[in-house]
Regions:
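Membrane-interface transmembrane helices that cradle and orient dolichyl/undecaprenyl
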Residues: 189-210, 220, 238
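Signature aromatic-anchored transmembrane alpha helix within multi-pass, membrane-resident enzymes
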Residues: 12-23, 207-215, 231-236, 253-257, ...
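Membrane-embedded, lumen/periplasm-facing catalytic core of multi-pass transferases
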Residues: 34, 38, 413, 420-482, ...
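Hydrophobic, aromatic-rich transmembrane alpha-helices
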Residues: 238-239, 313-354, 360
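Perimembrane helix-loop-helix junctions
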Residues: 3-7, 197-199, 229-260, 264-265
């Protein structure tokens, strides 16, 4: 027996301690000092659904999509109440997990989390962001374990650092979207996929890790319905890679279909279709804008299939042309595709990359139909989950090429220089933006931070609109997700035409939940090209640009809303103009409202 025990490397301890210190600093800084509130409509929508679940109201929503209401009305063959309206748009896992945390912190109590007069950021926004950030940090840990098993701890450490300093990852982590939950679940799934590949290459039974991977893929599909395309890639791979052939694939397929079956039966009972309102997102990829169809009460007239094939090809090409932004902006990640040409010596590494490629290809096919963009925080951004493992293959391939250079062979000190260069280059977007963001955060720390304005200004909704509108009434708005989340009131997405508006307005009146008014914000006039407003808001164009006309002239005499003959009936119903934030956010009320305490601007 040897008297020597393995020596503890102080360098490793120092490096890991430094990593954890930086990780904690970035986490606390982003969640508290630099946080600007939620800025994604889908994130706010899921958050308010989670709050309803925490209150014991089930999977219900306070954001009413006219298309969803029409579906429910047709399915029930009668008028459907706006209160406790059941949602069929979102996948259930993220709202359920968020609801558990909100229940724990008392997030269902509106009074407990009411904003103070000095606050600019809604307190529950930070809770939502913290949940998403927690999943992001867990994903870093899982990927470190996976990559160190596939390659080595050095490559795993580089990938962990790249993830930590990735601006795109932090953007999604703070958005409240389910992408970080998806990243963690996908990372867990492919960890067990690799374990199964290892077992198969060694002649052992791969059933257990392959099925465990299937469990995580099932959870993944419940976090975002589009991830079924990722699971499809795994099912195809498993059908050929693991013996006995087809057994694992069939088991995984059954695991996915069982919970999916319950969801589809639930959706059918509410909307009359097993895919609920979610299937209408297909219009985003094939027929113009998802927003257009969600805001209409006449679904048959809004599917424009002109140029269908060209739209699919365009989105497919977009995914390849903008592959770097899709892969979180990590410039080395696309080297994964070149590494497919390299003959890795270890069979599991060589086989694993084909599994990743197959899952990525099926995902790209799905997104070609449903649409995706690298700009902003796209809720359909699924390529993001592939970024860490593709980065690992890219770093490994670069390391192989680097190690074969003559000057590197002759100068051992240069052995890890390529890692340093990659980390610096990929971290620059985050590092360069930090000084300005930190400075702004420090200046506004007493007010909780700087809001995501335009178009969102939580105080106007949480402090003013909530006080104006009784809980029993509904609000029409161009940002119903924000009204539902911040004002905690039922909000209907403003239809584009007067006929659709009047149908929903009359339904609300018949249900003793008469609309209190119409809220216009920068979500309509400020986030669109001026030429696009008439096509998106049609009969309500004059109302949408009404506030801007008055701001430009400095007088209410230039109002366009009450001079529009198309809206005469609407003007009579909602004649009182209430500035919630000057005329940047205007509430057209059915009753006169005192507004002396509303600010003129953010």
């Amino acid at each position: 027996m040897s008297d020597h025990s393995p020596a503890i490397d102080p360098g490793i301890i120092i490096r890991r301690s430094l990593f954890f210190m930086v990780m904690i600093a970035l986490t606390l800084g982003n969640v508290f000092l630099l946080f600007r509130g939620l800025s994604s409509p889908q994130a706010m929508d899921q958050a308010q659904i989670a709050r309803e679940i925490a209150r014991g109201n089930g999977f219900t929503t306070k954001m009413i999509r006219p298309a969803a209401y029409t579906q429910a009305e047709n399915a029930k063959k009668s008028v459907v109440a706006f209160a406790k309206f059941e949602d069929t748009y979102h996948s259930p896992l993220n709202p359920l997990l968020t609801a558990a945390i909100l229940k724990l912190v008392g997030g269902g109590d509106g009074a407990k989390f009411k904003m103070s007069d000095n606050q600019l950021i809604f307190p529950l926004d930070r809770v939502i962001a913290a949940i998403s950030t927690m999943f992001f940090l867990l994903a870093i840990g899982v990927n470190y374990l996976l990559i160190s098993r596939v390659f080595d701890t050095k490559i795993a450490a580089v990938c962990a650092i790249l993830m930590l300093f990735c601006e795109s990852f932090w953007g999604y982590a703070l958005s409240g979207l389910p992408q970080m939950l998806m990243l963690m679940l996908f990372s867990c799934a492919i960890y067990f996929v690799y374990r199964a590949i290892e077992a198969a290459s060694e002649g052992r039974v791969a059933m257990v890790p392959a099925v465990i991977a299937g469990v995580f893929f099932t959870l993944l599909t419940l976090s975002h319905w589009m991830t079924v395309w990722i699971a499809l890639g795994y099912i195809i791979f498993a059908a050929f890679a693991f013996r006995p052939r087809g057994i694992v694939a069939a088991a995984v397929l059954v695991m996915i279909l069982i919970p999916a079956g319950f969801v589809m039966v639930h959706n059918s009972g509410i909307s009359g279709t097993p895919f609920g309102t979610a299937y209408l997102t297909l219009y985003n990829g094939l027929a113009g804008s998802e927003d257009e169809v969600m805001r209409t009460v006449n679904l048959q007239d809004n599917l424009n299939l002109n140029g269908l094939f060209s739209k699919i090809i365009r989105v497919a090409l977009l995914q390849t042309a903008d592959i770097i932004p899709f892969l979180a902006g990590i410039i080395i990640a696309p080297l994964f595709f070149i590494s497919l040409l390299h003959p890795f010596k270890r069979k599991p590494i060589a086989t694993f990359r084909w599994a990743i490629l197959l899952m990525w290809c099926t995902t790209a096919i799905g997104l070609a139909f449903f649409g995706v963009t690298p700009k902003g925080l796209d809720p359909n951004q699924l390529h993001l989950v592939f970024a860490p493992i593709m980065t690992a293959y890219g770093v490994a391939f670069l390391s192989i090429l680097w190690s074969r250079l003559e000057f590197v062979i002759s100068t051992p000190a240069l052995r890890n220089v390529h890692h340093i260069v990659v980390v610096i280059v990929c971290s620059l977007p985050l590092l360069l933006s930090l000084p300005q963001r930190v400075s702004a955060g420090i200046q506004n720390r007493d007010r909780g931070g700087i809001p995501s304005w335009p178009p969102y200004y939580a105080p106007a909704l949480n402090l003013n609109l909530k006080k104006i509108v009784p809980e029993s009434q509904v609000i029409f708005s161009d940002q119903p997700w924000a009204v539902a989340w911040y004002a905690d009131r039922i909000s209907i997405w403003l239809p584009p035409d007067r006929a659709g508006f009047e149908k929903l307005d009359n339904a609300a009146t018949d249900l003793d939940s008469a609309a209190a008014g119409i809220l216009i914000t920068p979500s309509s006039y400020g986030m669109n090209n001026l030429m696009d407003i008439p096509s998106k808001y049609k009969d309500f164009t004059s109302m949408v640009i009404d506030g801007q006309a008055m701001i430009a002239t400095g007088t209410t005499a230039t109002s366009l809303y009450d001079k529009d003959r198309k809206l005469e009936a609407v003007v009579k119903r909602y004649p009182y103009r209430v500035p919630l934030l000057g005329y940047f956010m205007t509430f057209y009320s059915a009753k006169p409202v005192k507004t002396s305490d509303t600010p003129d601007r953010p």
